[in-house]
Every structure is written in structure tokens, then in C-alpha cells.
């Protein structure tokens, strides 16, 4: 799913530079998306002969990708990966530690500030781009069945768009309408009882006795007293009768005028006992059914974020970090962004895209209690590794790297050779439109014609942009691409 504009934003943000035997450029373009959620790093001389190029494809907001871009270079530098006996293990630990750092209280405050800065203030009653995105998401989700929405948000809490979608579609209208009617009936009944209160004291006594009996039998006395317990993730909603149906139903023990003979009292008492017993059984079933509903798929709706999306919990970013040294290149990747090396015209993948349907990813997701539906984790994220997204990382029995969504990167170390020409690091907005070899051919051809790295990056974004949003979404995503060439003459 995604929110799109009526026409793409094709203005590009650019960065370029050179030094220490290489030249580089980066282009980022918003495209058809309502918001630009990508971020990147181009850091020459991160340490001595090491340079860092990273692409961070954000989702659910810009805050985690921007935070990563601002903090990760120093975070890696402090760990002195270049001195590590096992560089891969060092970088993997650094990524997981950084993900832990993201959920720290101070970091969460900073993420919120970043998110707030990215929301333009409203003027003249016009909605900002974030509101527009929410509006479009709500419209899209309104056409999705309730059960599917519950699956989608089951492990990640429920956002404001989901609640709006429920109301827009009316999937919960049956129970809610019944509850509203019951509440109205209860209010009318309360009014009637108040009017009769001074006229007939004995009726009041009967009602109080009935309520006392309900408490002794274990039935709830009033609304709002059912227990909400923390529950595991569920994939389907369990339909149950609203508790208010039983609670607001007229009591068989209420009496009419509060006057009865001893014989009538005995008969009524027997009838009342039988009726109350049946009602107690029904109440117990209703209460159990309601608790099952709370303990099941509706738990995120009732116990989740209360409609407010939390930065770092409901947002995240991929991270494809390319560390270029004097004689080798190291890539640490978490997510579906990608780094590719051109070696004598041939594409050499320096990373592997992480998708939920991959065997390794599927096994971890299932082990953490998650599900995969239509290529999405719990029907939500269509990727399986990322910084942030801590709403998917709530299994208390597992460490961060073992959660449904993990920041643990794959690390590849590749020795550089004289045949190596350039490296491309980009988000899936590029790779969904072109294969690795297609990108290498495209870039190599332009470089051979004398184009600069910046011109190459611009052209690649334009080539991948879709003409419309009528297709499957290919070419409609944010685009960020970094191209780094090796200057052999300066070495």
C-alpha cells in the first residue's frame, strides 16, 4: 500500500564530491509518494582510508531514516570496525546496538522532534502532506475487510488510520449499534427508575438485591468492569456478543409494584432463581467471549497505541551501508536496499535483499510468533529487516536480533581489483524498476559518454520513474541512488 500524489515531484536533491581516489554523487527524488522518507550518507574519510556511503529507505515516517543518517556514522566510527579481528561480527553487533539505541528514551524524544519538524504547519485550513497521506491511507483501508486489517496490525498496534477505516467502512457497526441502542435503553430505564424511586421504595430494594446477587454470582455489576489482559498476537478477529447486551437487559427480578403475598414471593423467588441462573450462565458466556475478543485480535485495538503512531515503534528504515577502503569494500545490509559493484562491466551484488518470504526470514518470523501474508509480516511490513519498527519487536523471550523484524545485517567483504569501475548503492525505488545488471549497463554507458556521477544519478531516477500510478507500484516509490567511481590515476 502507498499514498500517491496526483503528479510526481521530480525536483532532485543532490550531493557530490571527490577525494582519496574516488568521486561520488547522490540524487534523491520524492517521485509519486506523498512524503520523501529516504535519507543517506556520503562520508569521505570516515577514518583515514575508509569512506562511508549509506542509503536508508524509511517507512511510516522520515524520523528513523533521518536519525540513522545523523547518528550511524559516528556510531560505527566509535566502534573502530577497521581494527576488529572479525569485522562482520563487529558490524552486526553495531547494527543491533544501534537499534537498541533507537528505542532509548532520549532517542525516542529526538525521533518525535524530527517527525514534528517534517510536518508543515497548516495555513488557511489547508491540510499538510501528512494529513493527506493519512486521508488516502484511510480511504484505501476502508475497502479492506476487518479481519485482514486486524491481521495487518495485529503485531504492531493500531494506528489512527485503522480506527478511521473501521468507522468509514462500518465493519464494526453491528456490535457498536447494538451497544448504542442498549446504552440508550439503559439510560431510559435509569430515568424511569429514578422517577419511580420516590413512589415505590420496595421496587428499589428488589433491584438492589438483584445487583447484590449478580455480584455474588460473579457477574459484572456495571459496564466497563471487564478485564483487559495482555495477549499474544492473533491473526483473526473473534466475533462475540457485546457485553452490554447482557448487562443492560431488563432484570426478571425487578418487579412491577413491589407488593406480593408470601405465596407469590415463594413462586417468584423460584422463578427468579431459575431466571437469574440462566442469565448468569449467559453472562458468564458473554464475559468469556468478550475476554477472548480482548485477548485475541482486538487486543491491539483496545490496548495498543490508542490511535497515536509512535516514531521508532510504528516507523523504521532499511540500512545499506557501504564502507570503501583502500583495497576492499565492506557492505552491511538490513532490508531491501542494495549495493552493486561493477567489475569489468559485470554486476557483482554486494548485498542480498531481505524479504519476508525468504526461507531464513520466514523461519525467524515464525519463531518470533509472527505470520506472513501476501509477502507482509503480520499483513503489514513487506520487508523483514530494519532499524526501528519496535512494535514488531515485543517478544520478551527473544533478543533484538531474533525478533520478527530485525536490524541484524548481512555483511559481505569484497576485495577490490583493478577491474572494478564503480559502486551503486540505492533503495528499492531503483531496484524494483531495474535489475542489478541493467543498472550497471545504464550507468556504465553514461560514464563512457562523459557524464558525471551526478548526471548519472539524475538520469537513473528519471529512467525508473513511472508514467502513472496505474500499475503495480513499480516506479512510484521514493528514489535515492549513490554512484561512486574509482579514480585509478590518483592511486
Swiss-Prot record:
Basic and acidic residues bias spans: 112-125
Q: Where does the PPM-type phosphatase domain lie?
A: 23-486
Residues that bind Mn(2+) 2, according to the entry? Answer: 57, 428, 477
| Enzyme Commission number(s) from the entry | 3.1.3.16
Q: Which GO terms describe its biological process?
A: signal transduction
Q: Could you say which protein family the record assigns here?
A: Belongs to the PP2C family.
Q: Write down what this protein is called.
A: Protein phosphatase ppm-1.G
Q: What is the organism field in this record?
A: Caenorhabditis elegans
Gene giving rise to this polypeptide: ppm-1.G
Amino acid at each position: 500500500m502507498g499514498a500517491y500524489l496526483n503528479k510526481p515531484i521530480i525536483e532532485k536533491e543532490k550531493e557530490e564530491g571527490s577525494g582519496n581516489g574516488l568521486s561520488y554523487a547522490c540524487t534523491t527524488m520524492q517521485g509519486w509518494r506523498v512524503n520523501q522518507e529516504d535519507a543517506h550518507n556520503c562520508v569521505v574519510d570516515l577514518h583515514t582510508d575508509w569512506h562511508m556511503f549509506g542509503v536508508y529507505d524509511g517507512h511510516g515516517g522520515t524520523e528513523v531514516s533521518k536519525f540513522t543518517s545523523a547518528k550511524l556514522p559516528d556510531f560505527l566510527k566509535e566502534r573502530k570496525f577497521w581494527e576488529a579481528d572479525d569485522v562482520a561480527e563487529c558490524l552486526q553487533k553495531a547494527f543491533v546496538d544501534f537499534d537498541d539505541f533507537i528505542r532509548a528514551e532520549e532517542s525516542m524524544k529526538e525521533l518525535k522532534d524530527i517527525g514534528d519538524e517534517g510536518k508543515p504547519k497548516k495555513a488557511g485550513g489547508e491540510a499538510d502532506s501528512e494529513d493527506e497521506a493519512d486521508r488516502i491511507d484511510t480511504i484505501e483501508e476502508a475497502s479492506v475487510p476487518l479481519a485482514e486489517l486486524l491481521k495487518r496490525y495485529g503485531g504492531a498496534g493500531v494506528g489512527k488510520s485503522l480506527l478511521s477505516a473501521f468507522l468509514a467502512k462500518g465493519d464494526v457497526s453491528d456490535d457498536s449499534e447494538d451497544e448504542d441502542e442498549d446504552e440508550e435503553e439503559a439510560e431510559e430505564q435509569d430515568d424511569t427508575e429514578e422517577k419511580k424511586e420516590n413512589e415505590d421504595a420496595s421496587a428499589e430494594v428488589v433491584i438492589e438485591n438483584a445487583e447484590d446477587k449478580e455480584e455474588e454470582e460473579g457477574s459484572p455489576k456495571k459496564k466497563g468492569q471487564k478485564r483487559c489482559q495482555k495477549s499474544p498476537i492473533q491473526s483473526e478477529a473473534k466475533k462475540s456478543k457485546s457485553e452490554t447486551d447482557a448487562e443492560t437487559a431488563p432484570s426478571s427480578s425487578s418487579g412491577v409494584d413491589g407488593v406480593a403475598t408470601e405465596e407469590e414471593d415463594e413462586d417468584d423467588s423460584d422463578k427468579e432463581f431459575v431466571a437469574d441462573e440462566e442469565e448468569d450462565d449467559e453472562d458468564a458466556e458473554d464475559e468469556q467471549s468478550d475476554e477472548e475478543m480482548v485477548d485475541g485480535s482486538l487486543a491491539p485495538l483496545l490496548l495498543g497505541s490508542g490511535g497515536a503512531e509512535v516514531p521508532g515503534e510504528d516507523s523504521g528504515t532499511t540500512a545499506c551501508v557501504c564502507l570503501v577502503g583502500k583495497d576492499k569494500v565492506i557492505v552491511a545490509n538490513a532490508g531491501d536496499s542494495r549495493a552493486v559493484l561493477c567489475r569489468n562491466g559485470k554486476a557483482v551484488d554486494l548485498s542480498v535483499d531481505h524479504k519476508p518470504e525468504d526461507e531464513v526470514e520466514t523461519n525467524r518470523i515464525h519463531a518470533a510468533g509472527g505470520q506472513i501474508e501476501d509477502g507482509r509480516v503480520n499483513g503489514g511490513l513487506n520487508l523483514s529487516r530494519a532499524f526501528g519498527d519496535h512494535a514488531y519487536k515485543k517478544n520478551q523471550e527473544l533478543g533484538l536480533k531474533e525478533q520478527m523484524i530485525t536490524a541484524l545485517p548481512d555483511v559481505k567483504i569484497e576485495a577490490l581489483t583493478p577491474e572494478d569501475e564503480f559502486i551503486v548503492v540505492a533503495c528499492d525505488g531503483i531496484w524494483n524498476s531495474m535489475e542489478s545488471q541493467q543498472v550497471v549497463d545504464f550507468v556504465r554507458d553514461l560514464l563512457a559518454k562523459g557524464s558525471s556521477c551526478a548526471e548519472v544519478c539524475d538520469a537513473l531516477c528519471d529512467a525508473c520513474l513511472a508514467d502513472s500510478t496505474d500499475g503495480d507500484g513499480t516506479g512510484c516509490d521514493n528514489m535515492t541512488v549513490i554512484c561512486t567511481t574509482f579514480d585509478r590515476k590518483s592511486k
